[in-house]
Amino acid sequence: MNFKIYETKIREEFELVLKWMHNEFIKLRTGRATPAILDGILVDYYGSMTPINQLANISVPEPRVLAIKPYDRSSIKDVASAINASNLGVNPQVDVDIIRLTFAAPTEEVRKNLAKKAKQVGEEAKIRVRHIRQEAQDLFKKNSSTVEDDKKFFQTELDNLTKELNKEIEAVVSHKEKDIMTV
């Protein structure tokens, strides 16, 4: 019985869970400016909805400031109105050819709520790992012999791998919580 086949499949699915966690954590604003905050904002550009990062150069000149410089100066008002409509909680400051977004430092209460949301994301990731584990068990039962030693070995290896993956999730969540709570 070869556990490595199952382990490889589980780790591939776990990588998808980590990517999902990363995307969810990007949505949690820590007060620092990051271009990823603007992912998902679409601008009405000549009749088609276009992602903002395809219309402008986005940079971080200061830790709490995003600078957005549209490639086409005529689209600056459209970009600013799309940012306003996105409910980021930031008012764009429009200059001649650049838009500045200044993010306020989150209060203690807001940081605690963000840390709580980070924990919820971690719990959801653990649930996803449990689903992956269950799928692996079902696949093993369907494809394996009925030798009791093989079943015990598989179960032990699967439990160890699940614990390892959950520890990795906890480490990522702990790091994010520290990041959020840092003033």
Curated annotation (Swiss-Prot):
Responsible for the release of ribosomes from messenger RNA at the termination of protein biosynthesis. May increase the efficiency of translation by recycling ribosomes from one round of translation to another. Pfam families: RRF. GO terms for molecular function: ribosomal large subunit binding. GO terms for cellular component: cytoplasm. PANTHER family: MITOCHONDRIAL RIBOSOME RECYCLING FACTOR PSEUDO 1, RIBOSOME RECYCLING FACTOR. Keywords: Cytoplasm, Protein biosynthesis. The gene is frr. It is found in: Cytoplasm. Belongs to the RRF family. GO terms for biological process: translational termination. This is Ribosome-recycling factor.
